[in-house]
Amino acid sequence: MKIFFSGSIRGGNKYRRQYGQILAFLQAFGETISEHSDRPEAFDDGGLKGDAAIYARDTHWIREADLLVAEVSQPSIGVGYEIAYAEARNIPILALYHVGAESPMSAMVFGNPKITSIRYDSLSELWPVLKDTLAETHLPPK
């Protein structure tokens, strides 16, 4: 299973440290094809030249994905766009939301029946729920 992980980069990096832990967890279930989200160079566009190159790279990765997992605790137009892009291509979507986040989550995400939303208080609380949810996706294993 190919997993595209989406998390705020330019919109804020409060949850950046958690991205790495979530990515490491997801690697047990498949190939993560967007690990750039937890690397410092991602905040400098990962060495790509210009916004068009980043758009082309990320949309290519999403089209290649079997699943999109988005950490949505930090509001981000880019993450919302990636979610909509995946939805338009019938790619399953999991949205992870930290209940202690400063901003409430958009009803456009939590109200969407095509998106599986998981609220969590701590990463240790998230792991078993995420594991069970990934098992229920019935996507090809790693």
Swiss-Prot record:
Q: Which Gene3D superfamilies match?
A: 3.40.50.450
- Gene Ontology BP term (one): nucleotide metabolic process
Q: Which reaction does it catalyse?
A: a pyrimidine 2'-deoxyribonucleoside 5'-phosphate + H2O = a pyrimidine nucleobase + 2-deoxy-D-ribose 5-phosphate; a purine 2'-deoxyribonucleoside 5'-phosphate + H2O = a purine nucleobase + 2-deoxy-D-ribose 5-phosphate
| Keyword match Nucleotide-binding | no
List each coiled-coil range: none
What EC class is this? hydrolase
Which family would the database say this protein is a member of? Belongs to the 2'-deoxynucleoside 5'-phosphate N-hydrolase 1 family.
Assembly notes: Monomer and homodimer.
Name recorded for this polypeptide: Putative 2'-deoxynucleoside 5'-phosphate N-hydrolase 1
